[in-house]
Amino acid sequence: MELSYPEKLTLIKLAELKRAKVEELVKESGLEQVAVMRALLGLQAKGLAKLHERSERVVKLTETGMKYAQIGLPEWRALKVLREKGKATLDDLKDVLSEDELKPIVGLLRREGWANVRKEDGKLVLEITEKGREASERPIDKALKLLAERGEVPVKEIEKLVPVNELKRRKIGEEDVITERVAEITEKGEELVKKGLELKKEVSVLTPELIKSGKWREVEFRKFDIKAPVRRIYPGKKQPYRAFLDKIRRRLIEMGFIEMTVDSLIETQFWNFDALFQPQNHPAREWTDTYQLKYPKVGSLPDEELVARVKAAHEHGGDTGSRGWGYVWSPERAMLLMPRAHGTALDARQLAKGVEIPGKYFTIQRVFRPDVLDRTHLIEFNQIDGFVVGEDLNFRHLLGILKRFAVEIAGAKKVKFLPDYYPFTEPSVQMSAYHPELGWVEFGGAGIFREEMTKALGIDVPVIAWGIGIDRLAMFKLGIDDIRYLFSYDLRWLREARLVW
C-alpha cells in the first residue's frame, strides 16, 4: 500500500495516541494542520484511520463584549458614579459612558431598580436606590466573565446563566459553530504500523537546485494519483444563452446574411401591422395579443408616398390585382405606439429602405406579447427574423432554410411543417420540432410575402421570410426543458451548462 510521508508520520503518531484531536496530531507530528487533515482523509480512504467530526454551537465575545470585559458594563460604571454622589444628571455620566451607552442607561437602571428618575430644573436626574447600593454580580455579569476567561463557551452552558439573545441584543456576544475533529486508528492501521513504516521525506517539486546538484537521484519523489477526484474549477465564461445568440449571429453572417440594424424596441402600428398588410380590424392588434404604450401614445408615419401605397393596398389592393381588405384605412390608428410584437416589422423597414437583389437579411431582436408564463412561453422573448429576396425563389427554398435552422442550429432530430395562415404571407407554414421532454414544440412561422405587402414597399421580386422563437431553438441546443432557465440566475446551471458548437 502506497503511503505518502505525511500519511506515514500521521499514522505512526496516531498509533501512539490511539485517538487524538487534529490539533494534537499537528503538535506531535510537526506538520501543518492542512497536511495533517489531508493525510487523515487519505488514511481514512485507505481504511487505516477514522475521522470523526462533531459540530457545536458556541458563544464568543464581540468587540463590544471584549471592551466591557475590560472596563465593565455601562450600568456598573454609571452605578459607581451614583454610589459616590448619590444622584447624577446625564451630563455627570458622560465622563464614564459613551453617547451610545448613555441613551439606554436610564431605562436599564430603572428596570434593575437601581435608580429613581425625575426631572430637576428641566434636567433628568438619576438618584440611587437602596437596591442600587446593594447590587451585586448578576447572571449576565457571570456570563461576561466566563466568556472573557474561556473565549468560546457552548451555547447550552451560557443559556444556564443568561439567554444568548440577551447577549446578542446588547452586542456583547455572538454565536458561532465550531467543528471538533477527532482521529482514531483502525485495526488495519495498527497492523500496518506494527509491520514497520519507513519514514523517508518525499519531494513534491523538482527544483532547479535539485537538478544542478544531482540530488534528484537520491531523493524520493512523491507519487501523485492522477485519477484522484479534485475540486472542480469553474472558469469565467459567457452566459450560455448569450453565447448561443452570438454563435447564431456569426453562423448567419458566415452564410452570407446581412444583419439588420435596430434603433428602438418601440414601433408604430404602421410598421408592426399596416406595412405587413395586416388589416386594422385584425384581432391580433387588440390588447389581448399586443401591448400598447400609454405615453406617448402616437408616433410619426414615414414618407407620404410609402404611406399612400400601403393605404391603397389595404383599401383596394393597389396595383397588385388584389381587392385588398375593402375598408377605409386610418392613419391615426397606424400612428399608435407599441412595444414590437414580432421581428417581421424590421423586415418591412428594411424592404422599404432598400435591399440588394438577390440578398439575405436577418435580425435577432427582443419582442413583447401578453401570454401566460410557463415552460415554453415568455412575455418578453427573443426572435430571429429574416428574409431572402431574389428572382427565382419558391416555397421549397423556404422549407429547406427552415429545416437547416432546426437540424443544424437547434440540433433537432425530427421536424415537421404544417399549413398556417398569416395576413402577410401566402403560402404560409408553421414549423415544429420534437423535444424529448416537451414533445412537439412550435418554433415559428414562415411564408412568402404577399405582393400587397412587397409592392407597397417597392419590391417586385419574391421574398421568402420567417420569424422563429430563438429562445426555443436554444432550449434544444442547451438541453433544457424550461424556457425561463435561459434567463436564470441559478449559479449551478450557469456554471455547468454545456458550451454549444
Curated annotation (Swiss-Prot):
CDD domains: PheRS_alpha_core (cd00496). L-phenylalanine binds at T344, Q383, I384, D385, F424, F449. GO terms for cellular component: cytoplasm. Optimum temperature is 95 degrees Celsius. GO terms for biological process: phenylalanyl-tRNA aminoacylation. Mg(2+) binds at E426. Pfam families: tRNA-synt_2d. GO terms for molecular function: ATP binding; magnesium ion binding; phenylalanine-tRNA ligase activity; tRNA binding. Binds 2 magnesium ions per tetramer. Its cofactor is Mg(2+). It is an enzyme of class 6 (ligase). It comes from the Archaea. Keywords: Aminoacyl-tRNA synthetase, ATP-binding, Cytoplasm, Ligase, Magnesium, Metal-binding, Nucleotide-binding, Protein biosynthesis. Disulfide bonds: none annotated. It catalyses: tRNA(Phe) + L-phenylalanine + ATP = L-phenylalanyl-tRNA(Phe) + AMP + diphosphate + H(+). It is found in: Cytoplasm. Its main location: cytoplasm. Its EC number is 6.1.1.20. HAMAP family: Phe_tRNA_synth_alpha2. Belongs to the class-II aminoacyl-tRNA synthetase family. Phe-tRNA synthetase alpha subunit type 2 subfamily. Tetramer of two alpha and two beta subunits. This is Phenylalanine--tRNA ligase alpha subunit. It comes from Thermococcus kodakarensis (strain ATCC BAA-918 / JCM 12380 / KOD1).
